[in-house]
Amino acid sequence: MSEIKLIVGLGNPGDKYTDTRHNAGEWLIERLARRFNVSLNPESKFFGKTARTLVNGKEVRLLVPTTFMNLSGKAVGALASFYRIKPEEILVIHDELDLPPGTAKLKQGGGHGGHNGLKDIVAQLGNNNNFYRLRIGIGHPGHRDLVAGYVLNKPSPADRDALEKVLDEATDCVEMIFRDGMVKATNRLNSFKI
């Protein structure tokens, strides 16, 4: 199994989007940066904010694209190409409509499920979808016509509380990947309930 060398948190740039559901991936990267005691700094050649850290003696890069969500692949592709990071060495963290708030799932590969950030990353990695995903449940508004407005709005206080709890657990589980391996971290995160 490949080691994770790049962890990407998806979101939209700008204060207006900071607290919206679509930025759940970025929220987790910010927690990881605090956990690993590093700062995310703008790096224009990677179209995002990046940090480099050592986790259990292994070099890992954190990335938050500063492009809009549907262009996330531009940042991921640029950094992965520059550092010769393979798709299977990448973990992408993103919001997931098909999971309820307070849940998260880790998996490798799969489709994009209509998520425009994932769609662009797959395209920019040469149509390779073999990267890992950490999907943070944000719930579904009930009808597909409501999705765009839903993901670009703030979660309710109850949902935000559930998200905070699962983000704490996910932070521990990402760190666990480097200590105990992907299988143990996946089993722990995928069975988490609040």
Swiss-Prot record:
It holds the Pfam family Pept_tRNA_hydro. InterPro entries: Pept_tRNA_hydro, Pept_tRNA_hydro_CS, Pept_tRNA_hydro_sf. GO terms for molecular function: peptidyl-tRNA hydrolase activity; tRNA binding. The record marks D95 as: Stabilizes the basic form of H active site to accept a proton. Keywords: Cytoplasm, Hydrolase, RNA-binding, tRNA-binding. It catalyses: an N-acyl-L-alpha-aminoacyl-tRNA + H2O = an N-acyl-L-amino acid + a tRNA + H(+). GO terms for cellular component: cytoplasm. Its EC number is 3.1.1.29. It is an enzyme of class 3 (hydrolase). The active site is at H22 (proton acceptor). GO terms for biological process: protein quality control for misfolded or incompletely synthesized proteins; rescue of stalled ribosome. Hydrolyzes ribosome-free peptidyl-tRNAs (with 1 or more amino acids incorporated), which drop off the ribosome during protein synthesis, or as a result of ribosome stalling. Catalyzes the release of premature peptidyl moieties from peptidyl-tRNA molecules trapped in stalled 50S ribosomal subunits, and thus maintains levels of free tRNAs and 50S ribosomes. This is Peptidyl-tRNA hydrolase. The gene is pth.
